[in-house]
Amino acid sequence: VMAHCDHSDARECAAIRRAGVVVAHCAGSNINLCSGVSPVREMLQQGIWVTLGSDIAGGAQLPMYKVITMSIRASKIKRMETDWSEDFLTVPEGYYLGTTAGHRYFGGGEGFAVGQPLHAIVVDDGDFPESVRPLTVRERFERSLYMLHRHNITAVWSHGRQVK
């Protein structure tokens, strides 16, 4: 695992891909240290395995939902830096990188695959601002990811067991 890789050139990225190195993108740390914004979209297009990390030494957040949204925001900054040529991460992509991509490193399967132990949280979004129209499940998920606070988590499932 290599953290950040903000300034890896084409030769280094090719070596990272060939060696099967996992890049831990730590957007919060990169922003706090003013070290740059990783070209995550470019790395993904090159076939580099990217996951998300908090790098609490330089980052400021441990909750993965905050790491995910920070990574999406950082990718939007990268889009501006590249004159709009590099697409930013979507919420589903950020969620995948912050969950399944890292889980795979430890031998876990894809997402909510049959036979895989459940890892999930239950979110009460009742105190989130009302929308002017009914939200789809995806829109509620996206809103929850950005507005979530610890008190909104009403249940936690880990390895198929409810732990909260």
List where the protein language model places each region.
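Flexible loop residues that form catalytic
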Residues: 5-6, 76, 126, 161
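Short secondary-structure transition/capping segments
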Residues: 36-38, 63-66, 135-136
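C-terminal cap of metal-dependent C-N hydrolases
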Residues: 117-164
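A generic structural signal for nonpolar/aromatic side chains embedded in well-ordered alpha-helices
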Residues: 16, 43, 68, 144-145, ...
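His/Asp/Glu-enriched, well-ordered alpha-helical/loop segment
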Residues: 41-130
